[in-house]
Amino acid sequence: MSDSVILRSVKKFGEENHAFESDGSHNNDKKSRLQDKMKEGDIRVGFFELFRFSSSKDIWLMLMGGVCALLHGMAQPGILIIFGIMTDIFIKYDIERQELEIPGKACVNNTIVWINSSFHQNMTNGTVCGLVDIESEMIKFSGIYAGVGMTVLILGYFQIRLWVITGARQIRRMRKIYFRRIMRMEIGWFDCTSVGELNSRFADDIEKINDAIADQLAHFLQRMSTAMCGLLLGFYRGWKLTLVILAVSPLIGIGAAVIGLSIAKFTELELKAYAKAGSIADEVLSSIRTVAAFGGENKEVERYEKNLVFAQRWGIWKGMVMGFFTGYMWCLIFFCYALAFWYGSTLVLDEEEYTPGTLVQIFLCVILAAMNIGHASSCLEIFSTGCSAATNIFQTIDRQPVIDCMSGDGYKLDRIKGEIEFHNVTFHYPSRPDVKILDNLSMVIKPGETTALVGSSGAGKSTALQLIQRFYDPCEGMVTLDGHDIRSLNIRWLRDQIGIVEQEPVLFSTTIAENIRFGREDATMEDIVQAAKDANAYNFIMALPQQFDTLVGEGGGQMSGGQKQRVAIARALIRNPKILLLDMATSALDNESEARVQEALNKIQHGHTIISVAHRLSTVRAADVIIGFEHGVAVERGTHEELLERKGVYFMLVTLQSQGDNAHKETSIMGKDATEGGTLERTFSRGSYRDSLRASIRQRSKSQLSLLTHDPPLAVADHKSSYKDSKDNDVLVEEVEPAPVRRILKYNIPEWHYILVGSLSAAINGAVTPIYSLLFSQLLGTFSLLDKEQQRSEIHSMCLFFVILGCVSIFTQFLQGYTFAKSGELLTKRLRKFGFKAMLGQDIGWFDDLRNNPGVLTTRLATDASQVQGATGSQVGMMVNSFTNIIAALLIAFFFSWKLSLIITIFFPFLALSGAVQTKMLTGFASQDKQALEKAGQITSEALSNIRTVAGIGVEGRFIKAFEVELQTSYKTAVRKANIYGLCFAFSQGIAFLANSAAYRYGGYLIAYEGLGFSHVFRVVSSVALSATAVGRTFSYTPSYAKAKISAARFFQLLDRKPPINVYSEAGEKWDNFQGKIDFIDCKFTYPSRPDIQVLNGLSVSVNPGQTLAFVGSSGCGKSTSIQLLERFYDPDQGTVMIDGHDSKKVNIQFLRSNIGIVSQEPVLFDCSIMDNIKYGDNTKEISVERAIAAAKQAQLHDFVMSLPEKYETNVGIQGSQLSRGEKQRIAIARAIVRDPKILLLDEATSALDTESEKTVQTALDKAREGRTCIVIAHRLSTIQNSDIIAVVSQGVVIEKGTHEKLMAQKGAYYKLVITGAPIS
């Protein structure tokens, strides 16, 4: 067979298809398009763009809700007309009363006259009297107030209900579209986008958009309606005074504009900082076992806190700016008061253009307008925050994916042979444009043949497979299928023709049957059973208690590596693909499993094009064609024998792997003894239900989720059993009681001086309003004075007091804004930090709980800490403000008329009842809403963390359906909330009018029969009315308050939990001369999440200092569990693990783990530089660069790193995604070496490496093992045969132990294990 690479001609569907142009212009255009899209744009979302997802029904709901809000807003200006008329009547009545109290005056013929004066004098100076029946007038006005109150009740209910419902509908649609758009994105986009950041956007940012388009907008419309009607009425009743009052309005407008722009900018910066912190939290929680193994808890808390400090800084600036401009606007409003009364009194007293009632009408209308503009400005912060939050969301939604995996475009071939050809393909990853992966690659893969791709790590083998799946498009050249450029083919159809089995299989948290059905949605149960049989998975599945309905756990964490791999193969086989891609498909398997899986793969070779990437040459040897890769180029092609004769790349790899052994002899041994493997199914296939959670130490590099989290199955499929199981598991969602506020505030104690100053400032601000009502009623009373000079003098005094109030307000409002922003942001940072630290301090068994998977925990960190501010921070200031307002107002009211005050305060319990009901109901709704969104967050986390698998098997649509089901639950909760919230809000608004109605009715009686002054009636009514408004305003905080108590309860539940294995504890034994002697004594163990499955059943084995102990046995026998017990991820249920004669349960955990290093098969790297990842090996002290480089050299890593453009500062990407497996492994080994441990744990440390890398890494490991106690888990004999002790484990018990020679001589289980399955070199 020729070893040259042939470039065949290409069939074109049409000349207009630019995909076939050879100059690469199309590719360059795509590349530039991608780069343009990936750039962080300066696009800002306009407010009205937030409603882009509204339907016609939503528009009608918003229109009706808007009309209700506008009509509601007109109620207050409308009632001021009545108030003005009432004021004139009161003043006339009071003047008449004062005149009649003068000795010598009497009312004659409705005129007050001097009894002894002449008729002419009396006609000139007489005052009309006896025409005002004050009580009957008050009855009439009382009826009008009551009517307006009932109208407000109705309008307020529909105003809130309609806006909350339409907001929920639009947010539901936005979440759907956002998730759908993300699921359409090409893989290159995910390389440049943090999954943790996306989860934060789902959890936090969309919630901020909801705040901007729901009930807050209703409040804004209501307030603006009040403001506009007030202004119009003011101009109608007296344009001169209105213009004077409005003279300062441009300054108010400027203030509002500055607030909006500043808040938007600070919010954007704050959100970016929180998103970065969220990304770190997601990465760390997903890699919790690596963090625990290397003692990185405190280091990760510090890394997380650094980003919180940035967010805190911007939050404080936001509070300062808000406080200053709020004070600035209140100052202008009080200056307006002074100016209005000074000039208005001139128009009343000197020019007599206005009556006092008209003056009051104009003044109150314009001031009411100004105040409502001020209140509406607080909504601007929410709107600005919503727009800032929407920027990233909408950029993603509007971005057109370069490769749209759900597009209907492209051709579908009627028949497919399966011939694949690479034509001069050059490629680099979008996230690393400076590193060329494929360099002018050309090769042909013939239909129906098995083609093996071999080469060193980083040569481009796996990249070639990703191009075939069209995860990426070539930068230059093209890939063709049966002569057609794959870019011209429908991408969904293309991926349906391809089956993929990877080294690190991703299973989804549902049943085994549903995981296999992911391969083909319309598969019947018979198809699933057959696929399982073909993958040699049927027997182990049927041995499980629930068989095909067994839940696999998060990421397949409930299963061993071999079991997961066989389920993944079944999933690929059920598709009956024309092309099968095997990317290290059997490297993670033990010998027995590999043999069975290889047998399954051999069954389906006929009629399929198979492309295999493998490092075990025993797997490669049987291929029809082998293509050797080197530096992104296919350098040789041929059969096993042809390439050996050529003595090129392949020959070198074979030579390295065989280590001088005769490959043909190895094959004959396998053929001779393979028949003996039949007995091993019974001996080794049982044991633990999973391979002692192999994933506990080695994480999937592609997954952000912890493999040990056992979640209920997500409803990602239509299959009834899966969905039912999901529902049944809902009962496991833990309810929490709302946290007491005093405990929340206890966490703010370090900021007590800020809270004290802020509370004093808030108290002063709260007292300002009652003082204003006192001054206002006093000013009204001056108009009934008989002496005009006295009137002027008192009015000028009142105006001076208003100026003083304005000056005080600007100072105290700034202090309130700054101090509570400071205390609130520090609390948020503290809670996030404490929460994150508490999470990292939990025992590993806690993470096994379905309620604590990384997606849920990250969501809680993102939302709960910020929501706690609903009961602290600026909310405390608002509450103190309202409380002081109420107390001061009641004191003033009871001082001037206790009888009238009592009548009005009768209405207070109704307000309190309304608020209590609202708080109670909304607390429940907040909890339900959070549960629904956490389940939705779990779905998004699983889908996005495993996006390559999701895209490869084409199940985006199923995740989208599951996500939308959870959104529907959240929507139903919102609808129920709308009704309760609307009723409570309406009641709190309408009750004030009803209270006024009763007050004026009884006030009229007190004036008529008990001689109460009308100014006292105004004083009492306005004071209590304002305090009632404060009560209503307090209850408007109840939604935030309800959320805050639930969120705080979750935090306290976490902080209060005492983990059985406490990593932060200083207790426990430590000793200087740590030797590394290990004894497992009769250890029995079951995982907390699976108490019915016995994993270890009396394991006993010892290893002396400096010796190497190798654990061998079939998948699932409990090998890796022993490592976890040694690391104290868990403690044995019975028995003891002894370290140097000390019971591990009594040893200090940090001390124990600091003396243990681990290298696992699937190493977890962090999203930072290579240097930082190496230094992570020892977090107890600062590692020098020289020491890290020395470790890299020992791990055979240094030369590779120095070839990179940024060398040791090269970022490895999320979970090391920018590196090949071999490169990641060598970094992990360097990390372990730099730790200099006394005990070294090697869990399949070289199985993921290519032959060349394995040789160098094994040399490094052999050197690292010197002088250390070492425990090795491996499937390759070459790795373990030189061990001092080899322990054969079956069903959680050591059944044989000894040296290699001793065990082979016994011809027992070890002997059978060696000769069964894939050849062991």
From Swiss-Prot:
**Topological domains, Extracellular:** 84-147, 237-240, 341-353, 777-794, 1001-1011
- Residues of the ABC transporter domain: 420-656, 1078-1316
Residues annotated as region Interaction with HAX1?
651-674
Q: What residues form the membrane-spanning segments?
A: 63-83, 148-168, 216-236, 241-261, 320-340, 354-374, 756-776, 795-815, 870-890, 891-911, 980-1000, 1012-1032
Q: What is the regulation of this protein's activity?
A: The uptake of taurocholate is inhibited by taurolithocholate sulfate with an IC(50) of 52.9 uM. Pravastatin competitively inhibits the transport of taurocholic acid. Cyclosporin A, glibenclamide, rifampicin and troglitazonestrongly competitively inhibit the transport activity of taurocholate. The canalicular transport activity of taurocholate is strongly dependent on canalicular membrane cholesterol content. The uptake of taurocholate is increased by short- and medium-chain fatty acids. Cholesterol increases transport capacity of taurocholate without affecting the affinity for the substrate.
Q: Which InterPro entries match?
A: AAA+_ATPase, ABC1_TM_dom, ABC1_TM_sf, ABC_transporter-like_ATP-bd, ABC_transporter-like_CS, P-loop_NTPase, Type_1_exporter
Indicate which residues the UniProt annotation says bind ATP 1: 455-462
- Tell me what effect the entry lists for residue 125 to Q: Impairs N-glycosylation. Significantly decreases taurocholate. Significantly decreases protein expression
Keywords carried by this UniProt record: ATP-binding, Cell membrane, Endosome, Glycoprotein, Lipid transport, Membrane, Nucleotide-binding, Phosphoprotein, Repeat, Translocase, Transmembrane, Transmembrane helix, Transport, Ubl conjugation
Its membrane topology is listed as: Multi-pass membrane protein
Which positions in this protein are listed as binding ATP 2? 1113-1120
Q: Residue positions of the PTM Phosphothreonine?
A: 586
How are the domains described in the entry?
Multifunctional polypeptide with two homologous halves, each containing a hydrophobic membrane-anchoring domain and an ATP binding cassette (ABC) domain.
Protein name in the entry: Bile salt export pump
Organism of derivation: Rattus norvegicus (Rat)
**Mind giving the lineage of the organism this protein is from?**
Eukaryota, Metazoa, Chordata, Craniata, Vertebrata
